[in-house]
């Protein structure tokens, strides 16, 4: 059965129920990650966990009754200090929670979590925080449940900040190897956003949405041509594999 993964790290509407839409089409979400809101109309609970730098205490940030992240709890908890995001909870029933990534073939140190309060925006007049990624930051799950393997059909989508990007390798969200190693060309499927041009490029100077298929970024060809450079505050990216 085809499945979907969804991430929402930026702005969206609280009434959108992304994974309900996927489920109605027969492609249920097997992972649903968001720092800003619920991705199911019926979901209420944990969105992410933060850690306070002053004493290493942790706090789960839950949804409010409207489905938006309860950032007032975060602001109180992190007052007079700083916090990082340690866990991004999976809202689907699969429990595919993301934690900071372990060492791997491309990076021999564990990744750090993002600053919890750096990507501030609003949703329905409520302040929320996205995930502001910088070098050496990332999340992963290696013991995933129900995620496509091999050449099984899957799709994924991501909402990202359109003004924050770089040319490094590689800002992705998607389905990668579960051993943290490069196991060869074509061994992963993930959405890439940025202006890296070392393995592939689209039109203009970027940034672009491309597919990271391992050992290459795919901008499109033949039936689906390379896309344009993107100039927008927020970007919705989709990949069907």
Predicted regions and their residues:
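Context-gated lysine
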Residues: 2, 51, 56, 109, ...
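Short non-domain terminal segments
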Residues: 7, 74-75, 131, 191
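Fungal secretory targeting signals
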Residues: 1-16
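Short, flexible beta-strand-to-coil junctions
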Residues: 41-44, 49-57, 133-137, 160-165, ...
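GGW-centered surface loops in extracellular recognition modules
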Residues: 15-108, 150, 157
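Intrinsically disordered, low-complexity boundary segments flanking structured domains
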Residues: 6, 17-19, 34-37, 73, ...
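Short tryptophan-centered beta-strand motifs in secreted/extracellular beta-sheet-rich domains
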Residues: 225, 232-241
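Extracellular glycan-recognition modules
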Residues: 85, 93-231
């Amino acid at each position: 059965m085809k499945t979907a993964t969804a991430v929402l790290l930026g702005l969206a509407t609280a009434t959108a129920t992304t994974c309900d839409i996927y489920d109605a089409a027969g492609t249920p979400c097997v992972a649903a990650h968001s720092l800003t809101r619920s991705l199911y109309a019926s979901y209420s609970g944990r969105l992410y966990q933060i850690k306070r730098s002053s004493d290493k205490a942790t706090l789960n940030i839950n949804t409010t009754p409207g489905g938006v992240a309860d950032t007032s709890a975060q602001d109180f908890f992190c007052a007079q200090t700083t916090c990082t995001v340690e866990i991004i909870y999976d809202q689907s029933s699969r429990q595919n929670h993301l934690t900071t990534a372990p060492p791997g073939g491309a990076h021999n140190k564990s990744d750090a979590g993002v600053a919890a309060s750096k990507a501030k925006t609003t949703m329905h007049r409520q302040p929320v925080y996205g995930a502001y990624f910088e070098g050496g930051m990332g999340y992963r799950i290696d013991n995933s449940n129900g995620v496509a393997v091999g050449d099984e059909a899957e799709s994924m989508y991501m909402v990202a900040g359109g003004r924050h990007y770089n040319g490094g390798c590689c800002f992705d969200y998607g389905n990668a190897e579960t051993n943290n190693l490069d196991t060869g060309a074509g061994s992963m499927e993930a959405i890439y956003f940025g202006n890296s041009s070392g393995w592939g490029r689209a039109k203009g100077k970027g940034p672009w949405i491309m597919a990271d298929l391992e050992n290459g970024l795919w901008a499109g060809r033949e039936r689906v041509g390379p896309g344009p450079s993107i100039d927008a505050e927020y970007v919705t990216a989709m990949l069907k594999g």
